[in-house]
Design a protein with these regions (language model features):
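Regulatory, non-catalytic segments
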Residues: 114-130
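A broad detector of the eukaryotic-type serine/threonine protein kinase catalytic domain
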Residues: 90, 108, 126, 141-144
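Short Lys/Arg-enriched helix C-cap and helix-to-coil transition segments
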Residues: 132-139
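Basic nucleic-acid-binding alpha-helical/helix-turn surface characteristic of O6-alkylguanine DNA
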Residues: 1-112, 116, 166-170
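Short, flexible micro-motifs
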Residues: 30, 67, 98, 125-129, ...
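…primarily DNA-binding HTH/wHTH and HhH modules…
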Residues: 142-170
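Flexible, gly/pro- and Lys/Arg-enriched active-site loops
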Residues: 113-119, 146-151
Length: 170
């Protein structure tokens, strides 16, 4: 069974949906985004301890501060490549960014190969089921340009501004 809870965000952001298996967070996405539409069938709304912890984390984050803890989560379907990309995204600090190309270069270096596809990295970034906590919004295109965002470009812009991140609108 999958349980859900709505998180009401501050003005300027779409509200969010949290999902859980009953113990761990299994999803966090903006409502009305392309990510949300994948997850809306067969869910039961319920108050759970993991939702309280996630709400606390989000409250701190949306106040413009970096939370000093991470809610416990589980990611289903995490391939080794997606895990590599997810681990790198989690290393991007509040207020910082990386490009798809920079992530690809790190993976290539780690694997001792000449080159890794930035487009493949983009696919793994876009797959992320736990937005903000795994900060896919901090990944930018070449020259710090905005690219698509599963949570909606409006939300990506607002998240980057909240963190004081400069970017180029394309």
């Amino acid at each position: 069974m999958t349980f859900t809870k709505i998180y009401h965000t501050p003005d300027g952001f779409d509200d969010m949906m949290m999902s859980s298996d009953g113990k761990l967070l299994t999803g966090l996405w903006f409502i009305n985004s392309q990510d949300h539409s994948k997850h809306i069938m067969g869910l039961e709304e319920k108050d759970l301890p993991v939702f309280c912890g996630t709400k606390e984390w989000l409250d701190i984050y949306f106040s413009g501060r970096c939370p000093d803890f991470t809610p416990e989560y589980r990611i289903d379907g995490l391939t080794p490549f997606r895990k590599e990309v997810s681990d790198i995204m989690q290393s991007i600090q509040f207020g910082q960014t990386m490009t798809y190309g920079e992530i690809a270069a790190l993976i290539a270096q780690k694997r001792c190969i000449r080159k890794m596809s930035a487009q493949a990295v983009g696919g793994a970034v876009g797959w992320n089921p736990i937005c903000i906590i795994i900060p896919c919004h901090r990944v930018l295109g070449a020259n710090r340009s905005l690219t698509g965002y599963g949570g909606g470009i409006k939300n990506k812009i607002a998240l980057l501004k909240l963190e004081g991140i400069e970017f180029r609108k394309t």
